Amino acid sequence: AASDVYKRQEETERSSEEMTKAMQNMGYMGAVVEPVTHIKKKKLKLTYKVSSGKPYKIRSLKYDIKDEKIREYMRQDSADTYLTEGMYFDVNRLDAERQRITDNLLRYGYYKFNKEYISYTADTVRNTYQVDVTMHLAPFRQHNDNAPQNHRQYYINKVNFITDYNVLESSALSSIEINASIHYKGFPIYYKDKLYLRPKVLTNNLRITPGSLYNEPDVQRTYSNFGRLQALKYTNIRFFETQVGDTSKLNAYVM
């Protein structure tokens, strides 16, 4: 049927485009992928002819990082970078580097950071297969109209345990009704009628430390520890910003 032929043609074109894009992402900017059809014994065989062309390489790497603290963190772990001058202009590696830097900053208190703050400009050098790459770090903006500022580092202020599921359904913590609480080793534990887990079990499985910088892997470790506790249906960790003096802090509510 004509519609089947059209559909096949569309799929072939899409596959060619995807393969071309994949080649270009690996640095082969002039790559051309062409579908080639053979008919053998009334059967249609489809192959793709790939002309890769010459790969583009990174001639120079520059960094446009105005935030001094972040620049220093990046310098400290520069040995782990995925980028080097002379490597192929590989878009996947450029993106992996954005993610690597983001993961590191999330260990150092940058609670609100994400990889969209990091971008690149790439200029091809005329009549060569070379590219000059600059990495940019955008400043933090609370809202679009706010003045740009340095990215903030957050410290953990208090960690609270709430052991009643209905409590966490309430998005505004001010509206939480709790009729009992205890303090164990400096951690407030709030519950409604009955405390289902021993305080020691709660604190032993916690990896988030008051007074330390926010650290994303600690949050993930806390999730996996609590996920192994049979008595819990699910775990939820929420952070609320609070300003203590001129330090940005986070209050954590676990459960």
Name each model feature, range by range.
Residues 1-228, 247-250:
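Interaction-mediating elements
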Residues 230-233:
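Long hydrophobic segments that form regular secondary structure
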Residues 235-238:
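Solvent-exposed beta-strand/coil patches in large extracellular/periplasmic or lumenal scaffold regions
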Residues 241-245:
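AMP-binding (ANL) adenylation modules
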Residues 253-255:
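Extended beta-strand-rich architecture
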